């Protein structure tokens, strides 16, 4: 550190040392595919006069990067699922190399307001960071407990578990503007997250990725979020893994038309008969006149049909056919205007006028919904366009989808890697999908690796912790009500013993021996109140 009362020369020397250190850090292979729009100086001067400590989460981020790199190199997959609590984390660590923390699960089971609800990201913004801290502290505790045994030589090599499994957490849509994104990222780093994902939905209208009514923000607005996440990590000296998620595949709304990259996908009224007659004006008047919900739905449906709401390239195709033009004119237009061309509405109108000799009627303001949002028609190619824009600012790209569709996943992967070869990708193996209907049992077994072959190196079941917990408790409760202690003794305890589950000795699992050791150390080697002394019932399991 440097004293703020130090000489100007000393402060300048400290600042330069920070700049040099940051530039050296950014020159590491870890950052070869990461784009930053700011200099090391801009970060150094915002770190304060005390050099940042190395957060434990930074070590975990480095570990996660190495894990993902090995999977990418070997053509394998890091697969995991959403953990609810320390019990699940300690058992998962035996078999999986990453842990996921789901916003959905937190929304229903762990909100810091203690008010459960669906996944609308309307819980306090520290909810998911709190859960990360809960799990990470448990990981650290179980690691300390085990390390003591390793040092004492009282544990077999085959028993050793790597409890420090990197955690990737759900950052939702950032919980507000860029300052909120910065603070949220900071919280995640301080509380133990090795990585986070952040999505391109609006924070005010955020929905679960498998709900209707999803509204995305302009491309550049989400890029700004990603830049802010990385900036926060840089200020803290963190190697945070950043996953860019797009919900545009099934998005039906857009918050703003500010970014021309979105223009291809925005729906507009194509019938001049509705010119000067916005849908919202009609709805507002109907409300004042006492219209019911059913009335409003009918008015909206009839207006949309009359307005003939379409994408601009569809309007052009209709106009070309009406003017007697052949398919070559439409093909000429589509060769310059397509999902990945990033053509603005002004360029589309100019090209249409050049090819048809007239400007086409197209108004995307007229059909705006009650919240003032624009109508949007996403899709896989829309997701490709967005992922390509996000890729330079994130370590992995992820398209949220409505079905476990291999061909769609392939289209997305090929679209992204065509521009960014070798780009790492993530896939949500969502329990919202009906897997039994989606594919055969054999296909279920190979699905993860088939996606892995496409570049999806990190895959996760968001809510498996929730569902397995619910299933286990439902079944045990039913059997316990009917069979009494036989249900516990035979279905739980005996299976724990038969399978060598460490939790059967729950006192030892909870660290009672470790804490006894601390007590003895503090009291010169003796502790009459040791929890694991003579009389502990766990001796029955020897």
Swiss-Prot record:
Its cofactor is Mg(2+). The keyword Metal-binding applies. InterPro entries: ICL/PEPM, Isocitrate_lyase, Isocitrate_lyase_ph_CS, Pyrv/PenolPyrv_kinase-like_dom, Pyrv_kinase-like_dom_sf. The lineage of its organism: Eukaryota, Fungi, Dikarya, Ascomycota, Saccharomycotina. Belongs to the isocitrate lyase/PEP mutase superfamily. Isocitrate lyase family. The gene is ICL1. Pathway: Carbohydrate metabolism; glyoxylate cycle; (S)-malate from isocitrate: step 1/2. It comes from Kluyveromyces lactis (strain ATCC 8585 / CBS 2359 / DSM 70799 / NBRC 1267 / NRRL Y-1140 / WM37) (Yeast). Keywords: Glyoxylate bypass, Glyoxysome, Lyase, Magnesium, Metal-binding, Peroxisome, Tricarboxylic acid cycle. Mg(2+) binds at residue 170. This is Isocitrate lyase. SUPFAM superfamilies: Phosphoenolpyruvate/pyruvate domain (SSF51621).
């Amino acid at each position: 550190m440097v004293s703020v009362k130090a000489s100007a020369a000393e402060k300048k020397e400290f600042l330069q040392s920070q700049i040099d250190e940051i530039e050296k850090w950014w020159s590491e292979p870890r950052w070869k595919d990461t784009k930053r729009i700011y200099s090391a100086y801009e970060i150094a001067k915002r770190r304060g006069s005390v050099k940042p400590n190395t957060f434990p989460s930074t070590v975990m981020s480095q570990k996660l990067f190495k894990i993902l790199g090995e999977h990418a190199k070997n053509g394998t997959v890091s697969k995991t699922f959403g953990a609810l609590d320390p019990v699940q984390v300690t058992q998962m660590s035996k078999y999986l190399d990453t842990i996921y923390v789901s916003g959905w699960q937190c929304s229903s089971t762990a909100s810091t307001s203690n008010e459960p609800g669906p996944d609308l990201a309307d819980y306090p913004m520290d909810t998911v960071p709190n859960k990360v801290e809960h799990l990470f502290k448990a990981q650290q505790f179980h690691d300390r407990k085990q390390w003591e045994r390793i040092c004492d030589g009282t544990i077999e090599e085959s028993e050793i578990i790597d409890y420090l499994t990197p955690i990737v957490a759900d950052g939702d849509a950032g919980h507000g503007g860029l300052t909120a994104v910065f603070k949220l990222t900071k919280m995640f780093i301080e509380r133990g997250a090795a990585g986070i994902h952040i999505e391109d939905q609006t924070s005010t209208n955020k929905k679960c990725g498998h709900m209707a009514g999803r509204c995305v923000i302009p491309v550049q607005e989400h890029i700004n979020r990603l830049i802010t996440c990385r900036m926060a990590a840089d200020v803290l000296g963190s190697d945070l893994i950043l996953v860019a998620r797009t919900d545009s595949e099934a998005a039906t709304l857009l918050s703003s038309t500010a970014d021309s990259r979105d223009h291809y996908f925005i729906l507009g009224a194509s019938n001049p008969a509705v010119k000067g007659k916005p849908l919202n004006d009609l709805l507002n008047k109907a409300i004042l006149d006492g219209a019911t919900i059913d009335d409003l739905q009918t008015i909206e449906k009839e207006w949309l049909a009359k307005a003939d709401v379409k994408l601009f390239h569809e309007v052009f195709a209709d106009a070309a056919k009406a003017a007697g033009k052949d398919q070559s004119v439409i093909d000429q237009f589509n060769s310059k205007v397509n999902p990945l061309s990033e053509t603005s509405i002004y360029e589309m109108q100019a090209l249409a006028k050049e090819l048809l000799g007239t400007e086409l009627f197209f108004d995307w303001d007229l059909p705006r919904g009650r919240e003032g949002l624009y109508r949007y028609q996403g899709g896989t190619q829309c997701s490709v366009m967005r992922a390509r824009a996000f890729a330079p600012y994130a370590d992995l790209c992820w398209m949220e989808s409505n079905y476990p569709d291999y061909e769609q996943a392939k289209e997305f992967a090929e679209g992204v890697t065509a521009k960014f070869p070798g780009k790492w990708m993530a896939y949500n193996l969502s329990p919202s999908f009906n897997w039994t209907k989606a594919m055969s049992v054999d296909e279920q077994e190979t699905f993860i690796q088939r996606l892995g072959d496409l570049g999806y190196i990190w895959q996760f079941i968001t809510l498996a912790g929730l569902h397995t917990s619910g299933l286990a408790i439902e079944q045990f409760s039913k059997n316990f009500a009917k069979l009494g202690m036989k249900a516990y003794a035979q279905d739980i305890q005996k299976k724990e013993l038969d399978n060598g589950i460490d939790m059967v000795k729950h006192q030892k699992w909870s660290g009672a021996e470790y804490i006894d050791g601390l007590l003895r150390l503090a009291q010169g080697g003796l502790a009459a109140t040791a929890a694991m002394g003579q009389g502990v019932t766990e001796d029955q399991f020897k």
